[in-house]
């Protein structure tokens, strides 16, 4: 049998075995595991001398698996494993063997013993092996090992002692490690085991560790892992054992630990052990006494002196050791800050006593701990600097909170704050080691951002100190930057940026109306001006960090750069600065930079700067008539659109370049129209001829390129190039529009008509024609359809109702497409809703949609049918997924498949489109002779839902709102919307009221109460739906009222047909009708949800 297992295990682990062979071998091994004598078989596999390490490992792993199963976890089986494995282990560890077992096998043996411990130790396991620790200590001759201090001690005995320690560590990890999430039952069991250990074995273990620490140094050097494992045990167990077992009155135990602080092999374990000891949870005053008693700062004085005298003592070779030491000292300091917080929050303590304790702890920190941590923070290694950050966060938060507690509080800390800020300045600088973008980003994330946050806290604590220090730092660097490295100049710009952020966020605590005239703001303005005066030096710099940071600084602080006199004719300084900034942008420093990331970022920032400084730019354009031409000529090389290669997805490999290139088109469009929109300066009107010929300089190359694409034919590269050109034209139009019309008026058609000149309309009429021609050639390609919709949407505000003839043709071409995707229809419906909103009072627009509605609805249904077919195919090919979704649909928006998701999104867009008719008072379109045939289809879409669609509450909300509004607008068969200028008062559709009643009433009652809809009234989204159903019923009641006969068809249908049909009790029917007829809208909705649906749902 053992040979057979060996063959099977080898087959599974042989990389040359095929999948079928491995699967068969695994099945056969599983069969052996399930046999009655499985434990005996795999014990034999482990202890057999002929078994190799792989077989032993597999055997041990299988034993763990078998012991944890209910069938094998019986006393006889566990005792068998215990007896055989311990007997074999004694020979393996203590026998005079030439070689010891490899670590991975020793770890697996520890896991087997830990499993036995968890299943047999303490009364929660029936007291099967309460002598666990005694037996293993005897097995490994622990007493002999720790009592023999002779250097000739048997090495195997020391290895056995080390193994015992590691076993204890694994046990502690199993019962006390807080990083694992355990069940409540498991946690209770672990607590029971820990209680049993405290009562019976912890003192023994503590004595073992104590004796290990007393071993002769020569023995320690013979087996350094023994001391490390001992220290690890103390550090691991200390969180839940009695601290007095480790800390005695004479600190003898602790002094034994301290002696390993300076031993090379044990330093890290020693640091971690002490860290765990000082982190032991205690009451604040007990913790303070404890921290003072252990006298750790005296033990660490050596390291403070060493690093202060020779910072180069830290090298890459010993970096891990110093990181561990820094973490220890940081944690030591944090413990004191925790004491401060706990004392302050203790309501039982006297205020004066609190102040005394806090002052005492603060003095300890300032005198003994902070000087050491400042040295570590000032070290050149980022990892060591970062290790100190948790303490600084706590301590600065303490200073910020208590700065107002006494007049002398801040002065007492002034030296610290001054030193700390100086170190922040130094450590914020990039080092020569940071050479790649990844290096810079890592430094920013791990070091610089934290230091920036610390600076911001210092501003709040002592504004004058911060401003004085940062001003001196920036001034000195600006003065000497030409002689310094690029890192110094980059840091200078970064600190100016930080100063501006502190001002904007008002960390200085100024009155809002005083911020712009305050000393910090004046200081910032001075630095910004000095930077701009260094133009020649700036342009000569070839460093991407400086280039990007400078542009960000200028754009985000434009309001500080330009004074409040920017609107006056005498503000020549501001004009010069503005032109200077434009020239910097339009140079190799920025927009023509050789580095792609700088170029792309500058293109965005350039346009952002233009839009933010609209007032300044308009004034400068008015004073410099040729400036627009100069700007256009300078940046025209950047306007050329080129598709160099295309990937498998049909997109440009350089899509990022094009996406950012669009910002330039928007920016140049903004400048052109801003130049011609100075009403207050030129008194221009829409009828005044304005020269927009400069647009030809931009558009003509694009049109020529489009013509070339049409001539070449529909290759993937050509199609993508056409897409890019159309997107560029649309983005240019957007820039032209926002340059002409104030941002808060962009959607006001009256303002648009007033400000948009006829010459511009003529230009864009030609553009619309060109787009249509291009679209007619390539309308079967979805990215061309997408770009055409995008561009036409940007032309609408400019052309206003003059775009309708072009829109008509565009819609025809889109609806004629045979492969229209669902997402395209969704976007298209949004585009049409925008048209309805903007031109709902226009007769031509009304006629356009009157003709369009029927083919549009048919197209939507065609796409939905295609989606349903795809969904059926997906469901049939993957039935388990569909079943699982149906079973878990309760109370959630379920996405069954991609096709189902597409259908839901399309139906929601469809309902939103229908909503635009009621929102803009054009519902008469639905009642017209042309659309009367499609109206039943539309209404059926609104009253038909599947159970899964009911779970899509966001879609249902839109659908029910549309249904309510339809009933409100034409629920009795005539158009009831008085704001609808196209309604025909003589037109009436007979039977429409009866249709709404017969279709909607069942919806109102079935959705909440039919179990197939899984309606959970307690969930917010379903409760909202219930309010919509109540509103629907109320609208039905209102529209069904007949003032002539005083009858209401809705009430009649409820009382005589539907409610008796569903067997609603008579008293509830009477109550419902009474509330429906007497309550107002909001009152009825609340009653229907809280007193009708909710009450009846409780009885289900």
From Swiss-Prot:
Record keyword Membrane present: no
Major subcellular location class: nucleus
Membrane spanning stretches: none
Subcellular location: Nucleus; Cytoplasm
An annotated GO BP: tRNA re-export from nucleus
GO cellular component, one term: nuclear matrix
UniProt entry keywords in alphabetical sequence: Cytoplasm, Nucleus, RNA-binding, Transport, tRNA processing, tRNA-binding
InterPro entries: ARM-like, ARM-type_fold, Exportin-1/Importin-b-like, Exportin-T_C, XPOT
Molecular function per GO: small GTPase binding; tRNA binding
Purpose of the protein: tRNA nucleus export receptor which facilitates tRNA translocation across the nuclear pore complex. Preferentially interacts with tRNAs with mature 5'- and 3'-termini and does not distinguish between intron-containing and spliced tRNAs. In the nucleus binds to tRNA and to the Ran-GTPases GSP1 or GSP2 in their active GTP-bound form. Docking of this trimeric complex to the nuclear pore complex (NPC) is mediated through binding to nucleoporins.
Subunit record text: Interacts with GSP1, GSP2, NSP1, NUP2 and UTP8.
Similarity annotation: Belongs to the exportin family.
Protein's recorded name: Exportin-T
Gene assigned in the entry: LOS1
